Design a protein with these regions (language model features):
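Low-complexity, disordered terminal segments
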Residues: 1-4
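A cross-family phosphate/adenosyl-ligand binding-site feature
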Residues: 9-19, 24-369
Length: 369
């Protein structure tokens, strides 16, 4: 899962990712459990004061809606996977939260109210430069006031940050935030920029106390699939524009994987990118409303394909970093335009405009490698 074990004073002999007698091959892994079964089975590791947090979200959104603001639920940063109920050791997804923080800034500047589900300790809106300095040269910050965007104080009135650390906290908070944001209807965006763990240890399979480093000859773990909640988001907030992310290392499967997420989970758009240039290029994939559905010319995708998988019935918007300091500014602006284009009253006009485009542009899209 692109993860590392963060464990002081522990020896980890194997975190198996290859097939073995104890660990099934990836293709043989059991399907993720039903999301509601996951929530019902998690009692001790759910967020504290969840009901109070929901009330905060409801109150914040009600106030911003009285001001007729559009709203976005934005997730940012990585999630941890605890290995014990009384957690000492955990698996962590690497994510600085920079993309989420900087996209939050753009949504705020565009007049949106933002509910920010962020990893505690990750980058934060209007403070990314300060965090970078803190990591690179902390002594240089001593004796200096913290730099801040001139308009940040005013903009943050429209920001509600809620922190998480574990995969359990993230999924519970995501469900409540989606249900809360539904009050905004089509004026809502769900922007899923968090780096969410793919595998986890269920609560009922965890050690209750710290795993003793000398009790065994090393440590072997079998992880379960994290339930996929993308399909549930459209149940919790059916009128919101849902934007997810897809990162791959093989350019030949990227478009097919992005289109597959639209087909399988019903998301409205997928920000697709490749690992080697994700800071410089993102392609937003969405379904072409004038095409006769999305068609992917492939069966099972193995990840080792040497030729691009043809995909039809999608529209693409290529976002390049260009002269911007990061790609996140033009990326967020493109999502804002997409949301505006789908507003009531604009959808029909946009469809008529799209009808005038050449069919080859409407029916086929291939993100650059």
């Amino acid at each position: 899962c692109g993860a590392q074990v963060a464990a002081p004073r522990t020896r980890v002999v194997s975190l198996k990712s290859e097939p073995s007698a104890a660990t099934p091959a990836r293709g043989d892994m059991p399907e993720p459990s039903d999301p509601e079964e996951f929530f019902a089975a998690t009692q001790k590791l759910r967020p504290r004061c969840l009901e109070a947090l929901r009330e905060r979200m409801d109150g914040f959104l009600a106030a911003r809606r009285r001001l007729q603001q559009r709203v976005v639920l934005l997730t940012s940063g990585g999630t941890t996977v605890p290995l014990e109920l009384n957690t000492v050791r955990f698996i962590d997804n690497f994510s600085s939260g920079t993309r989420g923080a900087q996209c939050t800034e753009e949504f705020l500047k565009a007049g949106y109210a933002v509910v920010l589900l962020h990893r505690k300790g990750s980058n934060f809106p209007f403070l990314t430069n300060t965090v970078r300095q803190l990591n690179e040269d902390p002594l240089a910050l001593l004796g200096h006031s913290t730099p801040q965007d001139a308009g940040a104080a005013h903009l943050t009135e429209s920001l509600l940050p809620i922190g998480f650390t574990t995969i359990f906290e993230y999924l519970f908070l995501l469900r409540e935030a989606c249900r809360s944001i539904e009050v905004a209807g089509a004026d809502a965006v769900v922007f899923l920029a968090a780096a969410v763990s793919d595998f986890y240890v269920p609560e009922n399979e965890m050690a209750s106390q710290k795993i003793q480093s000398r009790a065994h000859d090393g440590l072997s773990l079998q992880l379960r699939n994290v339930p996929k909640l993308l399909g549930s988001i459209k149940q919790w907030a059916p009128r919101a524009l849902v934007v997810s992310f897809k990162l791959e290392t093989n350019s030949n499967i990227l478009l097919a994987k992005a289109a597959g997420a639209i087909l399988k989970y019903g998301v409205d758009a997928v920000c697709s990118n490749l690992l080697h240039n994700y800071r410089d290029l993102v392609t937003i994939i969405s379904e072409d409303p004038l095409a006769q559905g999305i068609r992917i010319s492939s069966g099972e995708i193995h990840g080792e394909e040497t030729e691009p998988i043809p995909v039809e019935g999608v529209a693409s918007v290529r976002i390049e970093r260009g002269s911007h300091s990061t790609i996140d500014q033009p990326l967020a602006q493109a999502v804002i335009r997409l949301h505006q284009d789908r507003s009531p009253g604009k959808t029909e006009a946009a469809s008529q405009e799209r009808a005038l485009e050449p069919p080859e542009k409407r029916l086929r899209a291939t993100p650059a490698s």
